[in-house]
Curated annotation (Swiss-Prot):
The gene is fusA. Belongs to the TRAFAC class translation factor GTPase superfamily. Classic translation factor GTPase family. EF-G/EF-2 subfamily. It is found in: Cytoplasm. Keywords: Cytoplasm, Elongation factor, GTP-binding, Nucleotide-binding, Protein biosynthesis. It comes from Gemmatimonas aurantiaca (strain DSM 14586 / JCM 11422 / NBRC 100505 / T-27). This is Elongation factor G. GO terms for molecular function: GTP binding; GTPase activity; translation elongation factor activity. PANTHER family: RIBOSOME-RELEASING FACTOR 2, MITOCHONDRIAL, TRANSLATION ELONGATION FACTOR G-RELATED.
Amino acid sequence: MPRTTPLEHYRNIGIMAHIDAGKTTTTERILYYTGKSHKIGEVHDGAATMDWMEQEQERGITITSAATTCFWMRHGQSHEKGTGAEYRINIIDTPGHVDFTVEVERSLRVLDGAVTLLDSVAGVEPQTETVWRQADRYRVPRMIFSNKMDRVGANFDRCLAMIRDRLSKRAFPLQLPVGSGETFTGHIDVLERKQYIFHDETMGKTFSVVDVPEEFKDACEIARHEAIEAAVEHDETLMEKYLAGEELSMEEIRRAIRQATIAMEFIPVFCGASFKNKGVQALLDAVIDYLPAPIDVPAIKGHLPHHDETFIEAPIKDDAPFAALAFKIATDPFVGKLTFFRVYSGVMASGSYVYNSTKDKRERVGRLLQMHANKREEIEEVRAGDIAAAIGLKDTRTGDTLCTEDNPIILEAMKFPNPVIDVAIEPKTKADQDKLAIALQKLAEEDPTFRVRSDAETGQTIIAGMGELHLEIIVDRMMREFKVDANVGRPQVAYRETIKKRVEKIEGKFVRQSGGKGQYGHVVINMEPSEQGQGYVFEDKVVGGVIPREYIGPVEQGIKEALETGVLAGYPVVDIKVQLVYGSYHDVDSSEMAFKIAGSMAFKEAAKQASPCLLEPVMKVEVVSPEAYMGDVLGDLSSRRGKIGGMTQRGEAQVISATVPLAEMFGYSTKLRSMSQGRAVYSMEFSHYEEVPKSKAEEIISKVKA
């Protein structure tokens, strides 16, 4: 089947922002204007197409990243697909709540460009900065849409100043708002020198284009000059022409801005009010004009299986070998497990076999689906640049590479943060126990930041996630979708243990010899702290065959399993480096199990001698409060072991930045509400792990042991 849309007409984009900036509302307008939906779904009614989970509709927030495909023809004319002139836009609407940061992370990994939304009243908020940094890490070109210009207090100039201060100095407005709050009617296109006025009676589908009013002419010319000057810096021919005073054509200007945006040297800024249907079509035009097609970004790199140092590329072509990355797993009530993936090269037909190079397994693709939020359309094949979902991939997980056995490649996987909060969960009946195990396994498959473990001492099932809301939604889904009835404990901080000094020649010896075949395993290890975030590093330094090769793996595994339960308070141990340096074996009695136990014994002894300490998650907290309550807010943060990082003015309010241990933040929202009569708000996100002060650590350890 030939390609219906040329690759240069593809746009794979994400919509990302802080919670409540209007991402889902903007996506709903895009679906409406591109003809994907015939009526607009509103978030506050619980009817948004992209928020299809019950939990999303009840809470009015986006939890999972819904994917959809639509078609757009530049200059405000949307067309049915198939005419060849339209552009295919694959959109992923991502959550803005910090607890669901994994959804943003995995979406950015497979996108070519992104639109960052701001609330024009609040400007750049903490989670805006977080998603911006995530996009920087994946080098995703992006543009900014300053939304909610219709709200009282909207201030485009202040937003622009905050963008340049906190996100990028290379941000340039290509539109200026006409009015703000109740008086907002549309925008000025600074490149075309025209004013766009949107008609309310057609829900913004029609608009008038008039000359720029006199009072906006100076601002328009300044913005135009700044934008063109910044864009032509990357094109010598245009630079010379511009400096010589020659007028550049609109096509030349757009091409220069496009090149600079794709090179991440230019951030175009637009404005509008999605809820009032103003500015969304112009934003779609800008996506076409300035964000990259798959062929505009460098080909993705990977390595050969079992050869991490041998790098290869997956060229963005239909006639290249097939290569795709699975970026999301979802459980669908009707078809079971859905695997969302992005195709980087080649073609794959439904019903064909693919090779999962990450797992070294061959799998059959049952059906291929084009997703529209939670609705689906069956398709026969996928090609380079497509984002689609497959049914039937049993062993594939988030971050796995799908390719052909003849041309294997492993694409760079995604890195996910560790959970910071734990909850104990107990099934109410025996029937619930079986259902609980299945539910937790499926939910953990979907979400790499959700972990399940069993407490070695109590036998309780412990679930861990990125925050209280994250775990609340997991438990809610477990009860609704999997019909599990369970008792849920209070959220607990996910403490960790580590060591502070190096220890050498620590012995672990496991011997059972009492007639018949016995057990014999003997190891000697060195152990030292490694850098934060390094996890567990194991090095085999054995020489002379004192431990046979087949027993090295079991030693490593024994230590790895022992890491689950630290020596201080039974918390998982992180960031250590172990060197296996010596040992001995017995021709008859040695076994894998004996060496596994010996490894575990050596680790426990080494941990006791290596100055073990307790670590706690520390959160980055931002509080926005009216001046009148600042004293109380600051005093309260200090009483929570908070460290104040700085204070800035935002409109009439003060913004306090601080780092506070997560253990001290439970119940903070209630306290802040009562301190400020409901006028202060806060947001928090994980920052780092830090050693717990001695007195506090003793308190935690004695509580656990009691």
